[in-house]
Amino acid sequence: MNSVNNIRSTFLDYFHRNGHEVLSSSPLVPRNDPTLMFTNAGMVQFKNVFTGLEKHSYNRATTAQKCVRAGGKHNDLDNVGYTARHHTFFEMLGNFSFSNYFKEEAIFYAWNLLTKEFCLSKDKLLVTVYHDDDVAAGLWRKISGLSEEKIIRIATNDNFWMMGDTGPCGPCSEIFYDHGDKIWGGPPGSADEDGDRFIEIWNLVFMQYEQLSKEKRIELPQPSIDTGMGLERIAAVLQGVHDNYDIDLFRTLIHASQEIIGVKATGDFFASHRVIADHLRSSAFLIADGIMPSNEGRGYVLRRIMRRAMRHAHLLGSKDLLMWRLVPVLISEMGQAYPELVRAESLISEILKLEETRFRKTLERGLGLLNEASTHLEEGDYFNGEVAFKLYDTYGFPLDLTQDALRRRGISVDVDAFDKAMKRQKAEARANWSGSGDCVTETVWFSIRDQVGATEFLGYETEKAEGIITALIRDGEVVDHIDLGQKAMIVVNQTPFYGESGGQVGDSGIISGANFIFEVHDTQKKGDNVFIHIGEIKTGQAKKHDCVELIVDSARRRKIRANHSATHLLHESLRQTLGSHVVQKGSFVSPDRLRFDFSHPKSISSEELKKIEDLANDIVLQNSKVTTRLMAIDDAIAEGAMALFGEKYGDEVRVISMGNNLEQTGSKKWWSIELCGGTHVQRTGDIGLIHIISETSVAAGVRRIEALTATAARLYLHGQDRRVYEIAGLLKTSPADVQERVQTLLDERRKLEKELNDSRKKIALNGGSVNSQGDIQTINGISFMGGVVSNILPKDLKALVDSGKKKIGSGVVAFISVSEDGKGSAVVGVTDDLTDTLNAVDLVRIISVTLGGQGGGGRRDMAQAGGSEGGKADEALVALKDSLKG
């Protein structure tokens, strides 16, 4: 069968047999490419190869590249689920030549694969070429035997590809498949080309020019090839279906969602199942590649995708959390081709659970507000864009969900008004932003780099060196000298000072010359390896070209080394304890402490934290040698070295290995092995001790631990011991019995608090020490009971109102509790026989307004609210009674 997995394998095997290096898909987050939000084409990982900035041992390559188009210029989100071929996630099959073969081989390889390997009928295929590309047209005739009418010349930019305003570019040749005359549409270049009969399945880009400017284009001395074929599209063709969502992969995912929800993918529910299947793929792959849902950047796009799928699950009537239950099905289909999915399965599931749980609350609130704001609208009307923006800005309800919810009613959103509101808010934010205060722009550092070269770093071998001053910067300007008392920056041709990078802070110390002493407070690495020593002249005057001695503060560096090495041990401990889904998301290494951020969907138990700490300290006690090696990156990865997600590494990397893998699991010799450019201890015993002092949440799916090492850890633990002894003295017990004594006191306190609350409720219900409003009154024919009480918890206040409802039988009960800090909490109850005419939510909001609150919520029979002005509790009850008078 031509399954998706078989088609992918056939493509890669075919090009491997034809001399191409089979490479793994690059991550969905482009490495060191700020121009792209997500990888959206196969050629993205080869940009620097095409432009000549990178060289590799191969000159032919083939990939199955995972791609996402859901933000920025390439945004298919709104169409997904409603068309046959729009996806947020897709796979791009490609073959690439880097100054090796060109048009003839590219055309031959494509034609041979389609007609011989995939056995497509020649009669079903036609091609386009750029209108003046006679060479490509001639080669198509020669290789395929296609007639002239099936080699269509296109004069538009659809058949000319450019990387950007400048850079490599060239004509394209697209291959189309004819689905037959039962489907409307004409061939490319015709009036009916927008129909669905003729579908592009493969694009061959012939990079033969370099665009130097808008007016100037020259021939490349060594042209290249970049091709791309959508796996989902070719799968539809080979499986004899016209719709991508009818291929085996999507049929399996949609069948699973139908089984779980119990609703078939027909009629109004057809698009929703397709949205869920597509968005599951993009969500899972983005999480596996290290993206976590958030309110900005890539994380926000992921959250939009996830929530759109969850919104459609809601439309299908899904009572339980859905998305995470589909993850095993997805991994069964795609895990073999993409093992990162398997490794991240638990993380993907937990993040989807967490996000869907949160979103259900947002959805319920947002849909209620949306329905309230759109009740007067009819089919063909426009929904107010300002209101849509308020839903987004205040309640976290994204625009695309508003559009989706209104689409079924035939109502559009005034997107222009939404955009204007968004721009207005951004302008206000910019006006209120004071900036970073950094007076030196990056261009200064690059200018220095061009003039004097990069700084040579000597700090791995020594903490003391000699050098020559190559640049001085004061107040953001390059100067020739700096004088006593002035704060400045010094650049030296070589330095033992480590410049802040990789989470490790910069070194401090002394730079001295014949006539000056400069105290270094910090060292930064700027503009392509220019090391900036930041500090103050303590004596004399420093000049450009002065010979200097540089001495690092070795005691401070020693503490930093211990903390940095500890992060490596903790990283491996976390992975062994929590799972292989743990990936470093950030770190901060200073002389005082270390901080380590990592992917994990939930808080860590005290037992897990103890195990993590114990594992790391076991390696410290080994006192094994820490090994530093320079290796080819492929060899390092093969040996098991962990690389930081999103970092771009050269062909040669620095590898730090720690600890003996005593269990000899697999082929891994070292306990911890990572790519790292930081400074480290010589033996693990130099770390002394590792103690975790906190574990917190940083963002959805990202946790943080903070830890101390060596003397700092010892002093911290001594302080903890001292506090335990002091507390034991206060409690008149021994340190060993402190926990038991505290538990006894807490139990006694809870018992007394319960007795006190019970007494307050009885007093309030019987009209005791509350004011006279505690009596039952009749207002406009309605029985009313209410009062003001002190320091009753909200849950007890509800119980008090329930008791009141039973006591009066029919009517309204309202109690307000005023806490010691002056805040007011109110609960209003309406007996069931009156809920058709009275709404507890409306009544409690009257109280809330008087108390200075923001409204309230609940059901028609019971609602609660609060406010900061508890002193107005009596006034609030009067306002409520006045409302009952009508």
From Swiss-Prot:
CDD domains with a match to the protein in the record: AlaRS_core
EC number assigned by the record: 6.1.1.7
Keyword Cytoplasm: yes
GO biological process terms held by the UniProt record: alanyl-tRNA aminoacylation; negative regulation of DNA-templated transcription
Listed cofactors: Zn(2+)
Molecular function terms, GO-annotated: alanine-tRNA ligase activity; aminoacyl-tRNA deacylase activity; ATP binding; tRNA binding; zinc ion binding
Cofactor descriptive note: Binds 1 zinc ion per subunit.
Keywords, comma-separated and alphabetical: Aminoacyl-tRNA synthetase, ATP-binding, Cytoplasm, Ligase, Metal-binding, Nucleotide-binding, Protein biosynthesis, RNA-binding, tRNA-binding, Zinc
Protein origin, superkingdom: Bacteria
Catalytic reaction equation(s): tRNA(Ala) + L-alanine + ATP = L-alanyl-tRNA(Ala) + AMP + diphosphate
Keyword tRNA processing in annotation: no
Gene Ontology CC: one annotated term: cytosol
Residues annotated to bind Zn(2+): H564, H568, C676, H680
Compartments where found: Cytoplasm
Function: Catalyzes the attachment of alanine to tRNA(Ala) in a two-step reaction: alanine is first activated by ATP to form Ala-AMP and then transferred to the acceptor end of tRNA(Ala). Also edits incorrectly charged Ser-tRNA(Ala) and Gly-tRNA(Ala) via its editing domain.
Entry domain remark: Consists of three domains; the N-terminal catalytic domain, the editing domain and the C-terminal C-Ala domain. The editing domain removes incorrectly charged amino acids, while the C-Ala domain, along with tRNA(Ala), serves as a bridge to cooperatively bring together the editing and aminoacylation centers thus stimulating deacylation of misacylated tRNAs.
Database matches in NCBIfam families: alaS
Family in the record: Belongs to the class-II aminoacyl-tRNA synthetase family.
Listed name of the protein: Alanine--tRNA ligase
Organism: Bartonella bacilliformis (strain ATCC 35685 / KC583 / Herrer 020/F12,63)
